[in-house]
Amino acid sequence: MKIPLLLQNKKKLLKIMGLFFLLMIISFFLLRNTVLNWAIDKVATKFKNKYHGEFSVQHAVFSGISAIALQDICLTSPAKDTLLNIEQLDANIKILPLLLAHIRLDEVFIDSTNIAIFKTAKKDNISFLLKSNKQEKKDSIDKRKGNIDIGNLAYNFVKTIFDVIPQKVQVLSTSIELQRDTAYFKTTIDTVSFIDGHFHCNINTVESKGKSLYILNGDVNKDERTLNFSLYPHQIKEQTSFPILKSFLNLSISFDTLFVALNHTDYDSDILQLEGKALIKKGALNHWRISPKDIALDYAEVNYKFNVGVAELSLDSSTSIKLNKMLIKPYIHYQHSPKKTLAFDFKIPKMDAQEFFVSLPTGLFQNLEGIQAKGELGFNMHFFMDTEVPDSVEFVCAMPKNKFKITSYGEARLSKLNEEFLYTAFERGHPIRSFLVGPSNPNYNALANISPYLQNALMTSEDGNFYWHNGFNENAFRKSIAENYKKGRFARGGSTISMQLVKNVFLTRNKTIARKVEEALIVWLIESNRIASKERMYEVYLNIIEWGPGIYGAGEASAYYFNKKAADLTLAESIYLAMIVPRPKWFKYNFDETGKLKPHVADFYRIIANHLVRKEIITEEQKLALLPDITLAGPAKELILIKDTLGVDSLNLPELDLMLESD
């Protein structure tokens, strides 16, 4: 008898639930306009309390079973300046998801949208949104720190984006206006259409830097969670700059075609995988931090795969990049917990050497343009750091080659190191003096005519392994990375004498990313192909480095400080000259008002002397007899007696032992 009773109770329960559900639906239809306006008022009140601005909808009503019509939607700042205005927004809401408290739109129609954002000295209608929520965001981040599942968070974000995309969208007459100080941008979009997974729009832009018209086409598959789009200028020959970037970031990007695709989305075993493709044709880029000239690239293609885990992000090793004919295989892995680690691998498999150089973007490495080579050339770099043990950092860099040979040097004329040439010294980016590096210059000194004490003291201080490395001191570079990370700032460099020489002789003084990479490439070309001997490189270096105000080379320095020839420098004088190379214009701060070296200098003398003893350059007796005591006899003597108006007591150099490279 119990079973029929249970069935009867179950039927009653189902009837009650059905009735309750029906009442909810009826109540919703009867009260839907009231509920809609109540919800809008609640949003408006919350916005006003939080940001002191105003959110309003002039007219809001349900029309039909599931259609909402909103008119005159407005968002204003506390100063009553309008950020957003939409004259009309009609949307069809899917009923079933709505009953489950999920808003899913079926169709959307928007007409006459105006967005105006200003941040100038006289007008600012956006800062109130950015400032009000700072502490709340910080508290939220602090609360969740260490407990965020990055993979799940990213997956839910991607899933939500695809879920909320309506089946059909039509947007008419959109205007977006942005201004920050003197930078100005305005775009108008007549029509945006999205029907059956395909979207299209024309984008007209007006900037302080010019006008442009772009066409955007693409497809979205909500079920598969894939998408792709193409963006290209209306008239390809115009090579117009991509909107906004030029005005606000001083970054100019132009192209014939930009294509981006997300081809696969998968979430399995707590890892989100995103795979896709991006390519650009006839691209050009310009930014003063990258290169002083336009960087041009005929073709670039990326086939990417991102992995996002619970506490890690990675660019998968299956990712490939193609620059013209060059294939690049990158790998990046960042782990947030239980400890922070960063791994980076960058590989260019060996390829035809001429195609290697031709594939480099023009304008990026100006000195390498026109270079001719044969054989094969590649590139490998590996980096790994465990932030808990920064001293264990791994860094390996190499350019494997096969029968590689330079047949023509192109723009750089790297072989000029073996000849007499005109050198121009720069200060703060401006040329201040030019002189010949060679026998025609009376201040020039061959290596044999420069004191061995100076040669070895300077090499010990600047690059102790100069004669044994191939232009790059990986051990010094690893120490530099670790030291800079531990101190949280740039505290130690890793440049070798070869790198300093190339920077001074071949490159501009523009501090750009391209210059640093070009510096490394030229160093490798010179060192690995023996374009100039180590002895010749060091000889040129000793004759061009700055050693004081307007003083260049060992010949001028020995006369300026000691009124003697470079060959006659003593051990104490040589160590002093080696010490001031990092900051030659500060030399006078090493002396007190009596003309004697200050006590702190003794540490540098001791460290250099110990290294020279180990290298058997000097004897133990010479070290014991060495005193940090020199007598200025040249024009420099007149400067040290001038009272120090800056109030500097000592030379603010990095820790002395960090200036020295290990043997």
Give the label of every model feature segment:
Residues 1-11:
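N-terminal Lys/Arg-rich, disordered targeting/topogenic segments
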Residues 53-57, 91, 373:
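Generic structural motif
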Residues 59-177, 195-230, 265-266, 271-272, ...:
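Flexible beta-edge/linker motif
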Residues 10-11, 15-76:
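N-terminal amphipathic/hydrophobic interface segments
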